[in-house]
Amino acid sequence: ATCSAVQLSPCLAAITKNTPPSAACCNKLKEQKPCLCGYLKDPNLKNYVNSPGARKTASSCGVALKC
C-alpha cells in the first residue's frame, strides 16, 4: 500500500465525531497500518493519528497502534 493519509478519509467521521468506524474505514486502516507510525512522526498528521478518537477507531477495527 502507498502511504497516503488521504486514504484514511473514510475514517474521518469515526475519528472526529466518535461514531463507530465503517467497514471501508477499517479496510483502509488495515491497509495503511504500516504507515501509521510514519504519520505519528509527521507534525501535520500527528494530532489526528494520536487523538483519542483515532485510537478508539483503530482499536474498534482491531488495528494496534504500536510504534
UniProtKB/Swiss-Prot annotation:
Transport is among the record's keywords: yes
Record note on pH: Stable at pH 3.
SUPFAM superfamilies for the chain: Bifunctional inhibitor/lipid-transfer protein/seed storage 2S albumin
GO annotation (BP), single: lipid transport
InterPro entries: Bifun_inhib/LTP/seed_sf, Bifunc_inhib/LTP/seed_store, nsLTP2
SS bond partners: 3-35, 11-25, 26-61, 37-67
A GO term for molecular function: lipid binding
Keyword field contains S-adenosyl-L-methionine: no
Thermal dependence of catalysis: Stable up to 90 degrees Celsius.
Post-translational modification: Disulfide bonds.
Keywords: Allergen, Disulfide bond, Lipid-binding, Transport
Role this protein plays: Plant non-specific lipid-transfer proteins transfer phospholipids as well as galactolipids across membranes. May play a role in wax or cutin deposition in the cell walls of expanding epidermal cells and certain secretory tissues.
Family indicated by similarity: Belongs to the plant LTP family.
Record note on quaternary structure: Monomer.
Additional comment: Found in celeriac but not in celery. Highly resistant to pepsin and other proteinases.
Name used for this protein in its record: Non-specific lipid-transfer protein 2
